[in-house]
């Protein structure tokens, strides 16, 4: 009986890992993206992994969100609840995205604009209470502030995104550094 329970746990873990491995990475978009996300907090929600229609349902929902420019983002559902947790109920991650050329991007207070790393997956380090990911990421993002373009990076969202190395199960996380303030193009 004990070995049967252990086998069930192992099989379930393998299915979850394989599902994560099969997630296609977010495609790079030419130019810059200006986005407003409906639901930024994320974590591990197992239900969408086992629902073959979850992506299709989210795409349908996101079409009705705010405007026709709204798109389903990232190929996953985000959990209802605080970021960094495990949730059994999920909502779709709908983002309004517009392609704009870099000089036209203006800072909008309180809005996510351009992210250096859009890959999102299961990153275990930031879940651990003894790992001060916020401090580490704030320092990392501050180091990027000497950009010649005048972009100002800020640590965004209180979480880490996985390092992009193809698709796979990520243990190490990279900081999600976002440009929050961008110098406006000088009017001439």
Curated annotation (Swiss-Prot):
Signal peptide location: 1-28
Entry's transmembrane regions: none
Entry GO CC: extracellular region
GO biological process, alphabetically ordered: defense response to fungus; killing of cells of another organism
Location of the protein in the cell: Secreted
Major localization listed first in the record, in broad terms: secreted
Cell division listed as a keyword: no
Keywords, alphabetical: Antimicrobial, Disulfide bond, Fungicide, Plant defense, Secreted, Signal
Stated family: Belongs to the DEFL family.
Designated name of the protein: Defensin-like protein 99
């Amino acid at each position: 009986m004990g070995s049967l329970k252990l086998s069930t746990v192992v099989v379930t873990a393998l299915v979850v890992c394989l599902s994560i491995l099969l997630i296609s990475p977010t495609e790079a978009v030419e130019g810059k993206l200006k986005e407003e996300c409906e639901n930024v907090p994320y974590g591990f929600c197992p239900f969408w992994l086992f629902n073959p229609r979850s992506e299709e349902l989210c795409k349908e929902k996101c079409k009705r969100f705010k405007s026709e420019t709204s798109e389903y983002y990232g190929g996953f559902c985000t959990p209802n609840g605080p970021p960094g947790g495990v949730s059994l109920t999920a909502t779709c991650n709908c983002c309004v995205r517009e392609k704009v050329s870099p000089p036209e991007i203006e800072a909008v207070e309180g809005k996510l604009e351009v992210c250096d790393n859009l890959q999102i997956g299961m990153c275990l380090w930031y879940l651990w209470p003894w790992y001060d990911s916020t401090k580490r990421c704030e320092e990392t993002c501050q180091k990027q502030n000497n950009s010649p373009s005048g972009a100002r990076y800020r640590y965004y969202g209180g979480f880490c995104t996985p390092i992009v190395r193809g698709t796979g199960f990520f243990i190490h996380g990279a900081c999600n550094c976002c440009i929050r303030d961008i110098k406006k193009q000088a009017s001439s």
